[in-house]
Amino acid sequence: MNPPAKTPWDEVGLTAGEYRLIVDILGRPPNHVELGMFGLMWSEHCSYKTSKRYLALLPQTGKRIVIGPGENAGVADLGDGFVVVWKIESHNHPSAIEPYQGAATGVGGILRDIFTMGARPIACLDSLRFGPLDDPRVRYLVGGVVAGIAGYGNTTGIPTVGGEIVFDECYRDNCLVNAMCVGLLVGDRIIRGRAEGPGNPVLLVGNRTGRDGIHGASLLASREFDEKAEEMRPAVQVADPFVEKLLIEACLELSGWDGLVGINDLGAAGLTSAASEMASRAGTGLDLDISRAPRREAGLNPYEVMLSESQERMLVVVKKGREGEALDLFAKWGLVAAVIGQVTDDGMLRIRDRADNPTDGAPGELARDASAVGVTGAATALRIVAEIPARALAHDAPAYDRPMAEPAYLAEVRKLDLDRLPDVRATGAIRLGTADPAVGPPAAAMLRRLLASPNLASKEWVWRQYDHMVRTNTVVLPGSDAAVLRLKREEPAESKASTAGAVDSVDSVGAVGAGRTAEAPTRGIALSTDGNGRYAYLDPFLGGAQAVAEAARNVVCAGAEPVGLTNCLNFANPEDPGVMWQFRRCVEGLAEACRVLETPVTGGNVSFYNETMGRAIFPTPVVGMLGLVEDIDRRMTAGFKRTGDAILLAGETRQELGGTEYLKLVTGEVRGCPPALDLTREKALQAFVLEAIRAGLVRSAHDCAEGGLAVALVECAFLGESGARGLEADVSAGAVPKPPGIRLDALLFGETQSRVILSCDPACEPALFDLARGRSVPLSRLGAVSDEVFVLRSGSAVVLREPTSELARLWREALPKALESRLAGTRFVRGDSTMTTVKGDDQ
């Protein structure tokens, strides 16, 4: 039987009901170009038609937040004249099809969201998810994605300073690539993406328009994959970081020019999105002559021009009569720019093209002749090829209340009978050779297995490929709890700023940027991305809350006050009621944690349809946290500093093994209830740790998370300074209940939340215990830092004794061994992610 013929709305990812609504809005059937434009803007990726009713639950205001959701990125005032812009977004589907270009264009897109607002990008982070490394295709994806991130970030001169990378079976078919960027405002103005002032000219700047990326938002990113997914490769955009670098400098110079009205990047949905959003935000219209759009190739029809997602392009509105100055500025930077239209006052997005340019023969074209509006020297033989209310495209997509139901799998996977799981044993607890199946493996052997697992092993192989020191502001390198950057003044190339049009004087929105003092301590920011898909799979509410708590805890461990967050919510098909239930519960968990921890959400991204032929990813919320380091000299790192320092545990250890890396390693399953999270205790813990750091009472601080207490302690030793890379510690200290009421594997490898490992001069212990009591935070002494031997006890029993150097070697070599031996001869180059074999000196 032949499959049913596709309807015109099917071809652009719309439903029959949505098509009827479009007919009602226009008062007529849409033509082919208009239907394609609606397909883009009403896609799940662009319109948030399923998610926006739930995203409204997230707190969006805070004492330092200047701009929340709705603009290109969030904005926070950090005081002393520093204004920071930051956002995270996904590029999952393109990266799964074409890993190098998908990842590279993901970085490029998030950079443009930042410098569009007048901020210089100063750092990138990435949160990555892949399938198991025994799969050759997964290894190909890992190599391509990492190379794409490195190739784009390194070329544009933006340091990639942190992130995370996780491997799990559920991401085998659908990898996740979430890119975050942070920028520092140049001058004292936030640039808005608004097309204000009827009669003002509109410029298209940057790369020439090509056929790459067509249907990227409507079909590639808004549907689950099937067996024909590879056929969507042309929908993946092509990156050019060299043009992006020129755009950064040109747009930042433009931000200091008094002729600028508004600017928006052409990201997902390309010119259609940028034009409709700029007009809709301002309540205006745009009249564009796309025959004047610079093109990469001949023969592009209006449908292709409006749907193209060619990268490194910006739409700019300037004051009438000042367009020549803008064109000169872009020419100085070697960028192609053209005036393609003007702002109107009728609210319509009107697209014109040459009358002799075919549209591809689609029926229903608007047949009226029309002269160009406001384009000097334009050809007169033009016709209108699309005419749509801008707001209908950008903001009036239908909102769905999709059915939801708790997934049936939860009742089964939450069952965990620990009586059937042999506990690990201490060194020498039984004679070697015992065959009793009820006796578990030695704790030392299990620690080695965990340290060699891809999820816990060192990610240095990844971050060494990124230039994390460019611009020389990175003061805490990748590998610690959070990256820390020094804040330095960013001055505009030209300072002719005015508050006219859509350009806000930052001082006009709450005295932002005021109060600069030369005597103030050097400030910094701490940045972290966090999320645990296993926890969210077992309990979406808890998984959402935990992502916020851990991200905040990480920046606190760096000596920073959490300011706010951006998030990327990665889920499977929202048409599945179980997925919608997961999404709602996860957002509710995020919202609750944000309220309690006072970390408002400034924006982000929702990525649905991360599913292939019924195989769904875990619900994966990723949080990008921004923290303020008031004095960069008080920043904190995870590694031990001096032999003899006391090692303390803030928080309690409970018997919680559900959803842990340890449980997955020994059983091959993700099950049980994930570790509980008491947000009131979490807030008290973070306040205690931050106060202790600012008071100079501690020498190191490290979040105790994936892998549990034993892994966290050994990481502190690995990251320690020379001569302070060992320890002797009692892991039962701080346990609730005390042994023998708690299993040894739970003591060592359980992932109880709200715990931080501290080290300090023994003379500071009394002050720390006093401070902890005042905050009602449990604090226990585990032991002391030593030289090069790693010793763990439970009470008087030695659990394990290992040379730190041997454990460190295993930890550092695990990921390169898993990847490099299999990627030998593989080269990923800009513009082509195909694997090629090279030999000898070429490697």
Model-identified regions with their sequence ranges:
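Compositionally biased, intrinsically disordered low-complexity segments enriched
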Residues: S498-R516
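Glycine/proline-enriched, intrinsically flexible loops and inter-domain linkers
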Residues: M1-S495, P521-Q843
